[in-house]
Amino acid sequence: MRSILLLLLALLSQAEMAPALTAEARYTHGVFYRDMQRQPVMQLKITGEPGEKITSITFTPGETSKPGDIKMVRLSSRDDWNGYTFNTAKYIHENAKGKFSKGKITFKQEYTLGSSPLYIWLSYDLAAGAVRNGKIDAVCTAINTEDGETTEPEVILADALEERKIGRVYRFPYRIVPYYRPRWVKGWGNAEKAVHLTPTHFNLFTDLIHFAYSVTAEGNIDYQWAGGGQSNKEVADEALEEIKRLHKEAKSKAKLIAGFAHMDGPMTTAVANPTTRRTMARNMATWAIERGYDGIDIDWEYPDSDEQWKNLGYFIADLREELSGSGISISIAASVGYKVPNYWTTDQLDFIMTMSYDDLTPDNHASMRLFQRDADICQNKFHMPKQKIVLGLPFYSNEQGKLTAQYGYSSVYNWNPRMKPDVNNCRLKNQDGTEGPMHTFNGPNLIAQKCRWAKENQMGGVMIWAYETDLPIKHKASLSRAMFKVLRQPKKKQ
């Protein structure tokens, strides 16, 4: 009798010690697109006693502006990774789908908990006519288990966030995204001949990347080199202040993105270690939130192996968790023909920007052929939706067959002021006045042609490297002038 009593007490003790089911909800994505399937809205992280069974999960559309824009609601899962990919057959498992009815949906889907956390993703298919800039939201109201218990997940937000920002449908039909180095914001180099930011620019492009930051191998945030013996921090901080002033003066709706680059060695080291990777994700998220950015762009040149690309994918998954509820976008710049893997990294991005230039072929370092090839790779190799493919334009020249001699477009033009708009190469003169090497670039006609192709093929837009080296926008030979005649920030919602 005593032994039976002891056994019952032991079983009761084990039951009391068994971990209760815990659930966390994170809003890891804040940018959504019209006419796109499997767009993640919420991540659930669930832990509990191994063997415990979940029998159903209920959601509502929360503060979604127009619930009717949600064509399909999907539930997916994975138990050993916190990232989401829409190519579900490879990396996560789509378990169920349905539609909201009377303001909710209950998935009667069974999950058995294991020793690792279970990650469940709620994703939406949005209608082609979804309201631009409309809110996209979800609330998990109940997670039910086999033993009759009901749990409502705790919403986890980014550490630096004071108030959650509900995700929104991207407000523009495409992106025009210049990179802008901080030392150019108030003038640098040949200031009277190069373009510099004015309020007008902020109502023409849709996003601006403040290309100012870097990282350390320990996962800390650093500043890029400012040049000229200036303080890296002061130049970057003053540039951000000026960018915000111009943005406000223009009453612009353009997004401001924090650009991280010049970090090959440190980035390689940091993302290879799970602890450092998470530290860097938290630091980067805090940095962007505290400074009021709308996005984070990573220009890592370059991950040189599949392992490094996979580590970048792990990092982006961690970064999304650390950005929970902020609405901040994540993008990368990539030479998409160079060791970029399918799905693992590219699926997690809000958009990718192709570096469709610096090609060593003899015709042009940034040909139309390369531009179209990169679009094809993103669509057919990475299976990326068109809305997420932003194609790169160069506003600079390369010496033919080399990458060691480059000049901004305004310099090339001012050395050859009689160039016609259809010219894409010229010989530069040496210092002694003799004929120098051939340089290739994109003239106004080719820039316009590329923009028309991107628009007609409904791509996600264009990115510009060396935007600040263009001629002033009112100049007849300005590349940005040619670009904005085809693609510009719409004055009204489209």
Task: Provide a role label for each language-model segment.
Residues G187-W188, A217-E238, R282, Y302-R418:
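Substrate-binding surface in catalytic domains of secreted glycosidases
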Residues Y174, L204-T206, K251-L256, G292-D294, ...:
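Short, well-ordered coil/turn segments that N-cap beta-strands
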Residues S3-L12:
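Sec-dependent N-terminal signal peptides
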Residues K386-W453, I473-Q494:
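Glycan-binding loop/region signatures in secreted carbohydrate-active enzymes
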Residues Y180-P182, A212, A258-H262, W300-Y302, ...:
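A cross-domain feature marking catalytic cores of carbohydrate-active enzymes
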Residues L208, I298, L319, I352, ...:
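Conserved, mostly hydrophobic/aromatic
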Residues Y170-T286, S478-R481, R488:
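Glycan-recognition patch characteristic of GH18 chitinases/ENGases
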Residues M17-Y170:
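Exposed, polar/acidic Ser/Thr-rich sequence context and nearby capping/turn residues
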